[in-house]
């Protein structure tokens, strides 16, 4: 009987610890996502800077990205196909000021946002995604239903 009383007494303690661990894990995921986004922005910057020093953009686009993709994939695993490297390049070109990149959004959010040509719409979706805590899937759904245009 005493054991049941002890368990009931510690239930708020257990709940508080669980909540702390859940929040800690959530913060960890957000921190990792933020660092990934910053890293991909830097990769995009390096690609653009290298491209600007090259003589032939067509050569760069095909050969260099394919070589980078093969080497990075071999060393770091998936996530570095030529398509994703092009997105990183476009990410830097679209957001040339690093501080303008919002840490609340994941790389998947940004890949979705990069498909938008309208800069005002893109900024509106960024603000809404952060304010409304949209997942990347929810953001994609809102864009596909032309939520901004309504």
Q: Predicted segment positions?
A:
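Basic, low-complexity intrinsically disordered segments
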Residues: 1-150
């Amino acid at each position: 009987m005493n054991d049941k009383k002890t368990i009931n007494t510690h239930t708020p303690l257990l709940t508080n610890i669980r909540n702390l661990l859940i929040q800690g894990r959530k913060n960890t995921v957000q921190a990792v996502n933020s660092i990934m986004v910053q890293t991909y922005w830097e990769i995009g910057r390096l690609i653009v800077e290298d491209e600007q020093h090259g003589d032939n953009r067509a050569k760069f686009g095909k050969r260099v990205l394919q070589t980078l993709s093969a080497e990075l994939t071999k060393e770091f695993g998936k996530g570095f196909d030529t398509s994703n490297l092009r997105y990183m390049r476009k990410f830097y070109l679209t957001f040339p000021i690093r501080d303008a990149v919002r840490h609340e959004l994941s790389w998947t959010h940004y890949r979705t946002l990069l498909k938008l040509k309208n800069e005002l719409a893109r900024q509106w979706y960024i603000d809404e995604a952060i304010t409304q805590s949209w997942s990347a899937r929810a953001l994609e759904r809102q864009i596909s239903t032309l939520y901004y245009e309504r």
